[in-house]
Amino acid sequence: EGRINYAQIEKVINTAMDAGSIGVKLLGGYYPFTPEETSNFIRAANEMTAYVAFHLGTTETGSRLDGLREIPSLLGANGRVHIAHINAYCRGSILPVEEEIIESLQILTDVRSQIVSEVHLARPNFTLGKCDPDGNVLADVCQNCLRLKGYATTADGLRSALMDGYASTVEETRTGLILVSGKRGVELFNEGNTDVQMSFPVNNSTSAFQLTVAKNSEDEFIIDAVGSDAGILPRNVNIEQCMQLVKFGGLEPLELVVKLSLNPAKMIGLENKGRLTEGNDGDLTIIDPIYGRAVYGVVAGRLVMIDGRVVGNGAKILTTQRGAAAVEETGIPYQVIDLTKAMMYAGR
């Protein structure tokens, strides 16, 4: 009683698609559905050829290794899904980190034909600190972060973690968003009545490295791409961290291109991006090989970054044919994509 049925799930996805969305994302670490509901969301999205991404976790599992273990049963024989930020489920909360990595890679290999996936490489994560009226932390992700260091999963536990420098919240400054802990962090937490963004240094460097470079017996990457995951926070370090992997020997330079450009484009069916080929969009990022950062950027033939400074403006909304009319009404430029060509449905 009070749960969501299949017809309601279809309505949710249809509404999103008609409004211009390319699909849906299930936030299992924050607003978990039952396993049956989660499976139904995936099935309904697949039947509509809608994109469906999944931050793991249901009412029976967490946003941890147990959530990944649940994937085969949620997908069944035919389900297709994008599993978000695999490294977030390998923080050592169930098994030692090394064992979680091995098991995760095996699960992903077993369902490879049904999933696409990525990792992010920043040490800090992103979560929400909101608490219920009794002071209990609501988000499973935030609870897990507190438990990792023995803090209570309460508002007071968050205040202690902020004072100790383990937790941070976000403050907007003239130069952008910054992570803040200590006394100022507690002040922001209290001013927001606990409903604030939180960050913890919980992403393990070992899992980030091993999950990024791992290959199967066919010499293919088990995990398709590297993503920023909430890049609005001061942790969009894809290029910098991947260049460290190149310097270390974990990735070849062209493999960096596969992880950061080619596969992300293929994942959502952007056939004109991800490679320098005649007839494709003229996109180019020039990286300083010494400092490992982007210094020049060209998008569709237009210079958008000079010496690391963004000089471009404007953007396009990606939508599907059924959402084009709604997006057109906004007056914002848009591009229609064909999700039958997305890696999730078209294969690798």
Residue ranges of model-derived segments:
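Acidic (Asp/Glu)-rich catalytic clusters
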Residues: 13-18, 41-47, 71-78, 110, ...
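Short, surface-exposed connector motifs at secondary-structure boundaries
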Residues: 20-25, 47-53, 80-82, 194-195, ...
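Flexible loop/turn segments at secondary-structure boundaries
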Residues: 32-34, 60-62, 90-93, 124-129, ...
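Active-site neighborhoods of metal-dependent hydrolases
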Residues: 13, 22, 87-89, 95-244, ...
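Active-site microenvironment of metallo-dependent hydrolases
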Residues: 14, 185, 189, 204, ...
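Divalent-metal coordination cores built from histidine and acidic residues
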Residues: 1-28, 45, 49
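Active-site beta-loop-alpha junctions enriched in small/polar residues
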Residues: 1, 27-31, 55-61, 86-89, ...
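Active-site-adjacent beta->alpha loops and helix N-cap segments on the catalytic face
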Residues: 31-44, 63-67, 97-98
